[in-house]
């Protein structure tokens, strides 16, 4: 999937590693969400959104009780959604409730990223906060990964408004990412690395 966004490219790489068999619930998604085709496995995807204009299967607020029985889904997706939910605790608790035993929750959230709408932008979470949020909601086997390559991926994102063509992004993203990797190779655990300056998780 072509996109000029460094973060989106990282998100799509992560989603392409997923394999889920069974029904999936995509919170905040739409029928036009291009990342659905990246997920491997035999599944159907139902989308739920607060905004009907997104072209969604179901309209409901993820901050309220979800209209599904316990253990209804093999997978739940939160793709760039949790930062928009003021009551993220209810959303995470409900996601754990509707997942089948052994089901998969997969999500991405921005960190070093501009304030954005849809409909409002409330939070930025660190790795430590995400791990605790998920544990508090009842999740086990939690894995959180940084997205981006470090400070230069953040710099690229700040310049994104000037990158008007995908072909230019195809040149600049490997360049900026390569600089980050070179810095980390010379000085591992530096404070410009993705561990300290992630675009997201």
Model-found features: residue ranges?
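Class I SAM-dependent methyltransferase Rossmann-like catalytic core
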Residues: 1-18
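Short N-terminal micro-motifs specific to bacterial/archaeal maturation
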Residues: 2, 6, 56, 79-82, ...
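Residue-level marker of intrinsically disordered, low-complexity segments enriched
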Residues: 5, 18, 76-77, 140-142
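Conserved SAM-binding loop
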Residues: 17-116, 127-131, 198-200
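S-adenosyl-L-methionine-dependent methyltransferase catalytic module, highlighting the catalytic core
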Residues: 86-90, 94, 104-201
